[in-house]
UniProtKB/Swiss-Prot annotation:
UniProt xrefs under HAMAP family: MdoG_OpgG (MF_01069)
Predominant place of localization: periplasm
Database matches in InterPro entries: Gal_mutarotase_sf_dom, GH-type_carb-bd, Glucan_biosyn_MdoG/MdoD, Glucan_biosyn_MdoG_C, Ig-like_fold, Ig_E-set, MdoG_OpgG
Organism whose genome encodes this protein: Pectobacterium carotovorum subsp. carotovorum (strain PC1)
Entry protein name: Glucans biosynthesis protein G
Cellular compartments annotated: Periplasm
Pathway annotation from the record: Glycan metabolism; osmoregulated periplasmic glucan (OPG) biosynthesis
Length: 522
């Protein structure tokens, strides 16, 4: 009896302790946590209502200012958000001005609260720009940037910039801003005109002291779409952004661009400058790379065409695609001011199966380097029904290590060079013959392993607008790879000419596919 009573009391005590422990653990778990579902609820509600165009509250003085004046408005570094919080991440904000004339709402998310970060003119140094502090006191921000000690432990540098429509830029260690990513592209290059969705509101999680990543939520809105986004930024040698998106269509669209990248290409070795220029190349990216679902790797050198050009690549369940800057030697660019050799490549790594669709490349004519004239994205063959969410997940890589962005088992295109075609005469003088020549160097570990006497051959095809008059493959002792020389004759110069090539050894494919376009009127 004594043992039984003691056992009973012990069990009661144990139950009381367990009950207290459960209550303690429940109270330790936040009753509420912000997530993409909260943003998705707003996006879905927006999609069920008519679109309300954002209204500008910007005084004319700021809207009409020139770029040089806008540059004078600088954020006060000593007022960086989270300056007094134990975290390596800091926030700074963009002032409205010029075409950045619509405010976005920016919120801070903590474990228990969501609070708007209010605009104040005290955040900014206006330089010589005269302004009425009273007129701008409730102006709102144009966007924001994220700072992090990515290059030096004692120095905060920009790693993320979110400014304008749904554009954002990201850099890793030792990189400078180049190409941009976007949340969504709608009807790009269609005759009806492109629609530019915009991020209208952001929620930024306050990072914990030891966090090495930053979480940003965004609400996207446009006349025919609304969406919720979650960006998880991992700064590093290669900065990585995990993207989760839930998109709701308000109305039918002609084309939906998923994971769009935007860049600039003015000229390069495959399309030399029409005027004398000491720079061998001037571009943020020089090619589109695609890793198709069937395992094929494709490299498409970029062009600056005289007319709008759209190239499509049917890709089911893509493994990756991106706009790359291949070739990192300073001598490839020779620009001390803009350092195109330090600009990152952007690579999209889809998560899960995206289904049937196309990678689309849009090339737009530009006369100078101030215009982004290159767009690449994946577009699904079957668009989501109006009101039903399209769930997309992918990872963005911003890197200068292009070697990781192609298969180690096949060679890749190191460079593409274009020139007037010629034929060496009996007197050893080269005589132009009216053709166009392409020099394509393939390199890679698998080619280095081959003896130079290996019978490497080419598989080449050309569209109806061209004729191959020379197809020559030879060992390149400088690169320990193989060089392909193609000379082609164009039938109608007013039309583009498409060509493809790869190197093989018997039945074995040795290289990625070089997919090239000679633009019209070149």
């Amino acid at each position: 009896m004594l043992d039984n009573k003691f056992g009973f009391k012990q069990r009661v005590a144990s139950l009381r302790w367990l009950s207290a422990a459960i209550m303690l653990s429940v109270s330790a778990v936040p009753a509420w946590a912000f997530s993409i579902d909260d943003v998705a609820q707003q996006a879905e509600k927006l999609s069920q209502k008519g679109f309300e165009a954002p209204k500008s509250n910007l005084p004319a003085q700021f809207r009409d200012m020139k770029f040089a004046d806008y540059q004078q408005i600088r954020f006060n570094n000593d007022k960086s958000y989270w300056n007094n919080v134990q975290t390596p991440f800091k926030l700074q904000f963009y002032h409205q001005g010029m075409y950045f004339d619509t405010p976005v709402k920016i919120n801070e998310v903590t474990a228990t609260t969501v609070d708007e970060i209010k605009y104040s003119p005290e955040y900014f140094d206006f330089g010589s720009v005269n302004h009425d502090a009273e007129a701008v006191k409730n102006l709102g921000f144009a966007g924001f940037k994220v700072l992090y000690p990515i290059n030096k432990a004692d120095k905060n540098d920009e790693i993320v910039s979110m400014l304008g429509a749904s554009y954002f830029r990201v850099v890793g260690k030792g990189q400078i801003y180049g190409l941009s990513a976007r949340g969504l592209a709608i009807d790009t290059a269609l005759p009806s005109g492109e629609e530019f969705p915009r991020f209208r509101e952001f929620w930024i999680e306050r990072p914990k002291p030891n966090d090495k990543h930053l979480v940003i939520y965004a609400l996207l809105d446009s006349p025919r779409a609304a969406g919720a986004y979650r960006f998880t930024v991992y700064p590093g040698r290669d900065s990585v952004v995990d993207v989760q998106a839930k998109v709701f269509l308000r109305d039918k669209v002609g084309k939906l661009g998923i994971a769009p990248l935007t860049s600039m290409y003015l000229f390069g070795p495959n399309q030399p400058s029409p005027t004398l220029n000491y720079r061998p190349a001037l571009n943020d990216s020089n090619g589109l790379s695609i890793h198709a679902g069937n395992g094929e790797w494709i490299w498409r050198p970029l062009n600056n065409p005289k007319h709008l050009s759209v190239s499509t690549y049917a890709v089911e369940n893509p493994k990756g695609f991106g706009l790359l800057q291949r070739g990192r030697d300073f001598t490839a660019y020779e620009d001390l001011d803009d350092r195109y050799d330090l600009r990152p490549s952007g690579w999209v790594e889809p998560k899960g199966e995206w289904g049937k669709g196309k990678v689309e490349l849009v090339e737009i004519p530009t006369a100078d380097e101030t215009n982004d004239n290159i767009v690449a994205f994946w577009t699904p063959d079957v668009l989501p029904e109006t009101g039903k969410p399209l769930d997309i997940k992918y990872r963005l890589h911003f890197t200068r290590d292009e070697d990781q962005l192609h298969s180690p088992n096949i060679a890749y295109v190191q460079q593409t060079r274009r020139s007037a075609g010629d034929v060496k005469q009996s007197n050893l003088i080269r005589q132009p013959d009216g053709t166009i020549a392409y020099i394509v160097d393939f390199v890679g570990p698998n080619l280095k392993e081959l003896d130079e006497s290996t019978p490497v051959a080419s598989q080449v095809s050309i569209g109806d607008n061209g004729e191959i008059v020379e197809n020559n493959v030879r060992y390149n002792p400088v690169t320990h790879g193989w060089r392909l020389t193609l000379r082609l004759r164009v039938k109608d110069a007013k039309q583009p000419t498409e060509m493809r090539a790869a190197l093989v050894n018997g039945e074995t494919t040795l290289t990625e596919t070089w997919s090239n376009q000679l633009p019209a009127n070149e």
